[in-house]
UniProtKB/Swiss-Prot annotation:
Its main location: cytoplasm. One of its GO terms (cellular component) is cytosol. Pfam families: RRF. This is Ribosome-recycling factor. Responsible for the release of ribosomes from messenger RNA at the termination of protein biosynthesis. May increase the efficiency of translation by recycling ribosomes from one round of translation to another. It comes from the Bacteria. The gene is frr. It comes from Shewanella halifaxensis (strain HAW-EB4). The keyword Iron does not apply.
């Protein structure tokens, strides 16, 4: 039973780390990256559709994204969706493709983005600690129900703490890499 609680905690902590990585990937750096446009929804036949379902996104060069729309009638809608996103991008259409130059980040904007990234990392750490708290309380419930000994509880808490420390270190490593990426250029 304790092993099930520990493996559940491991799985949930892994998900917390992945979620933190995903949230940090959404933060724009100075480099062009196709995942930058993953959150954009385009109106298509009356419903909002993810951009990657109506177009392919590729890297033109280090500071330019190229969007190739599958249906030429969608070019204006895709362009409007990119403009209205909160990414601060200014697309230019050229025939069947849309070029999106990425403006250089100012020092002030970099510092703001670093604050955002640090907040995301802290949210990840908090989520991991909440998983630890849940796992420890589940083990204490087992002790109250006399399904395990006090030594088992202590051992389990130590194991869960080691898991927590390892996962928080992963979040810190992701944060350090993202901060380094933001301060380049």
């Amino acid at each position: 039973m304790i092993n099930e609680i520990k493996s559940d905690a491991q799985t949930r902590m892994d998900k917390c780390v992945e979620s933190t990585k995903t949230q940090m990937a959404k933060v724009r750096t100075g480099r062009a990256h196709p995942s930058l446009l993953d959150t954009i929804q385009v109106p298509y036949y009356g419903s909002l559709t993810p951009l990657k379902q109506v177009a392919s996104v590729s890297i033109g060069d280090a500071r330019t994204l190229t969007v190739s729309v599958f249906d030429r009638t969608m070019i204006a809608a895709v362009e409007k969706a990119i403009m209205s996103s909160d990414l601060g991008l200014n697309p230019m259409s050229a025939g069947a493709t849309i070029r999106i130059p990425l403006p250089a980040l100012t020092e002030e904007r970099r510092k703001d983005l670093i604050k955002v990234v640090r907040a995301e990392a802290e949210n990840g750490r908090i989520a991991i600690r909440n998983v630890r708290r849940d796992a420890n309380s589940n083990v204490k419930e087992l002790e109250k129900e006399k399904e395990c000994t006090e030594d088992d509880v202590r051992r389990s808490e130590d194991d869960v703490q080691k898991l927590t420390d390892a996962h928080i270190k992963l979040v810190d490593d992701v944060l350090a890499a993202k901060e380094k990426e933001l301060m380049e250029f």
